[in-house]
Every structure is written in structure tokens, then in C-alpha cells.
């Protein structure tokens, strides 16, 4: 075969003039190259120093195959789909198990990324969930929580992606302690939905961190239970309660507007009336304590929504994921790609509020 002949000739040239080294037979090996499986007879030398250039070329092709597999998997293709594409490109059929073996390195890389050290301080941290179909004993939706942070240089990064089957205070304590163990010492403000138990454990792990509950989620939950004939008016009232144009607003004044709103609608809607009875709802107004130029950036978790759209686009071509590990791996790949893109651009409005820069 031509490749074997090339390697034999290459060894002959290599050994010319080397009195202390000679040929030492061949070893068999198999590789994929030029669209098919190749049986190679690799020449050896007695000192074990000879390395044919042909092998380097084949290794380059193998690396290209792995890189392409990673990229296709990261874009949501299944191992079967990747195998079909590889067969068209390289002319050799790759089974699901073969592709899984190739992508095992990809799994390891994503795990290392999720466990990487984090910065000591983050100006703001956002937590939001995306729900994906996961196959365990049966197929069902599970929540994956994305934690995104604004760094001291005003750029963003995904700090963690975590699968929590059910919310609880102990679960959130474990999550926050996890990012603390990876190096986080302080957080300016943490923005989240009304997640069960989170408000209780934040001060236990990051004692000086302020908590802002997502106003957009609150509005959505309120309006979902309002009759169509009242929706426009309730939405307008909520717009006045959470008025972003009032630069001199205070938490106390805004919260009183919230109580008045609750009392106004309590006869028609019990769920709105109940809002006035929960003092923890004051956490929806934490954003007012900060400079008016960043209030729109910290009163909602919508900053993660752009990333969630990328997640949904990637998972759209998958009916369900075979395991939560595979879902975590795919989410990690998408997040890493976005960190190299728009998340690298600084959000300079955060420089207007020095309170968020305080290392606590």
C-alpha cells in the first residue's frame, strides 16, 4: 500500500548514516483516513526514535473529526445524526457508541469548565431556570438553573449550571456554598425569581448580599390570573408601582404604592389582595437602592433570557435528552460559546454605582 511504502522509504532515509540505529520490523495499526479504514504497517527502529510523518497527518484528521463531533454535539445533534454526517464526510460508518467515545473528552472538558475557579467578587448575580425534557425512568421536564455574574470589569460569565429536581432552602444553600468553594467571597446584589427558600439562605452564605426578586416574573404571575377585561388596567397600575422613571424614588414609597395596588384589586382578585400580607415582597424593590442608570438591569432576570433563547434553539432539534448529565454538557457548551461572544462586552453602566463594588 502507498502509505506503508512511504513510511518504509521514510525510515530508510531516516536511518542513513546512523551506525548505532537500524530497522526493527513493523507494528500493525488501524486508522481512519481518506474515507476508509486503513491497515498500517508502521516501521520501527531499534532505538524507538523514528516517527513517520504520515502518522502525524492521520492524527490531524482524527483531531478534526473530534473537533467536528464536539461542534455538532454542541449544536444539539444526536450521536446517530453525528455518525451519519461523519460517514458522508469520511466514508466510514461510526456507530453511536463510537461517537460517544469520541465525545467523552467533550464531557470531561465541560465538567472542568463547570468546576473552574471563580472570581472573588461579582457586582451582580442572576439566577434563572430553563426547563428541559429529560429521560430518566420516563420522560419529564426538569429545571436547570443558570447562574450568571457581572464581573469587576463589567463583563459577564456563566458561573454555574445546576440541575435541581425540586427547590428547597437546603438545595439553594448547597448551590451557594458550591460557588463559594470555587472562590466567590462576595456578591453585590443577587437577582432571582421567587425561588423557594433562597431568600432565607442568601444571608447564611453571603451575609451582606442584597436580594432582588424578579419584577417581570411577578407581573407575569399576577396578570396570568386576571380576567381579560381588567388586564390592561392592572398592567398599567403595575407600571406605576414599578416606575423606573422616578429617579428619586425610595423603597418605602414604592412599597406603599404596591400595598395600595393590592388593596385596590383585592375584592376582584384574591391573589392580588394577598400580596399586601407578605413583607418579603419588599424584596421586589431592592433595585431602588441603586443608581437609576442600572435599575433596569437589576430588577429582572431577563438578562439571562437571551442565553435561554440560545439554549432553546439548540435543544429544539432534540426531543429529549438521554440524561441530565448530557443536558448539562450541552448547556455548558452553549454557555461557553456565548461567553466568547456578546458576554465579553463590558456593561459600563455598572460603574455608576459604587455600592456594588464593595468587597464584603
Model-derived segments and their meaning:
Residues 241-360:
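Acidic/histidine-rich catalytic cores and adjacent linkers
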Residues 2, 18, 27, 77-124:
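Electropositive nucleic-acid engagement tracts
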Residues 1-56, 345:
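Short, conserved DNA-binding cores of transcription-related domains
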Residues 64-76:
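Short, amphipathic alpha-helical "recognition" segments used to contact nucleic acids or chromatin
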Residues 189-196, 201-239:
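Conserved beta-strand -> loop -> alpha-helix junction used to position metal-binding or nucleic-acid-contacting
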Residues 41-46, 53-58, 64, 92, ...:
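RNase H-like nuclease fold core
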Amino acid at each position: 500500500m502507498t502509505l506503508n511504502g512511504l513510511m518504509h522509504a521514510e525510515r530508510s532515509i531516516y536511518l542513513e548514516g546512523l551506525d548505532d540505529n537500524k530497522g526493527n520490523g513493523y507494528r500493525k495499526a488501524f486508522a481512519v483516513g481518506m474515507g476508509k479504514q486503513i491497515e498500517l504497517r508502521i516501521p520501527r527502529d531499534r532505538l524507538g526514535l523514528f516517527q513517520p510523518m504520515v502518522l502525524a497527518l492521520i492524527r490531524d484528521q482524527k483531531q478534526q473529526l473530534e473537533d467536528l463531533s464536539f461542534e455538532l454535539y454542541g449544536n444539539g445533534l444526536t450521536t446517530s445524526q453525528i455518525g451519519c454526517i461523519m460517514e458522508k464526510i469520511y466514508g466510514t460508518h461510526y456507530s453511536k457508541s463510537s461517537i460517544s467515545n469520541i465525545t467523552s473528552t467533550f464531557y470531561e472538558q465541560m465538567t472542568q469548565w463547570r468546576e473552574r475557579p471563580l472570581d472573588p467578587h461579582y457586582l451582580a448575580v442572576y439566577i434563572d431556570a430553563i426547563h428541559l425534557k429529560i429521560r430518566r425512568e420516563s420522560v419529564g421536564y426538569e429545571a436547570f438553573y443558570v447562574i450568571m455574574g457581572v464581573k469587576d470589569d463589567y463583563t459577564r460569565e456563566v458561573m454555574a449550571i445546576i440541575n435541581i429536581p425540586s427547590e428547597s432552602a437546603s438545595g439553594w444553600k448547597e448551590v451557594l456554598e458550591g460557588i463559594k468553594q470555587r472562590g466567590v467571597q462576595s456578591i453585590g446584589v443577587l437577582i432571582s425569581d421567587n425561588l423557594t427558600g433562597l431568600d432565607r439562605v442568601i444571608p447564611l452564605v453571603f451575609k451582606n448580599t442584597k436580594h432582588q426578586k424578579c419584577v417581570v416574573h411577578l407581573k407575569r404571575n399576577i396578570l396570568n390570573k386576571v380576567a381579560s377585561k381588567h388586564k390592561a388596567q392592572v398592567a398599567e397600575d403595575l407600571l406605576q408601582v414599578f416606575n423606573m422613571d422616578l429617579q428619586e424614588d425610595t423603597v418605602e414609597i414604592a412599597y406603599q404604592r404596591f400595598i395600595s395596588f393590592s388593596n385596590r384589586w383585592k375584592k376582584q382578585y384574591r391573589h392580588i389582595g394577598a400580596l399586601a400580607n407578605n413583607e418579603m415582597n419588599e424584596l421586589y424593590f431592592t433595585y431602588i437602592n441603586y443608581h437609576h442608570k442600572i435599575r433596569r438591569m437589576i430588577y429582572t432576570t431577563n438578562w439571562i433570557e437571551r442565553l435561554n433563547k440560545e439554549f432553546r434553539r439548540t435543544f429544539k432539534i432534540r426531543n429529549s435528552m438521554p440524561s441530565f448529565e448530557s443536558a448539562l454538557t450541552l448547556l455548558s457548551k452553549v454557555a461557553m460559546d456565548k461567553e466568547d461572544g456578546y458576554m465579553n462586552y463590558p456593561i459600563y453602566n455598572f460603574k455608576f454605582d459604587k455600592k456594588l463594588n464593595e468587597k464584603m
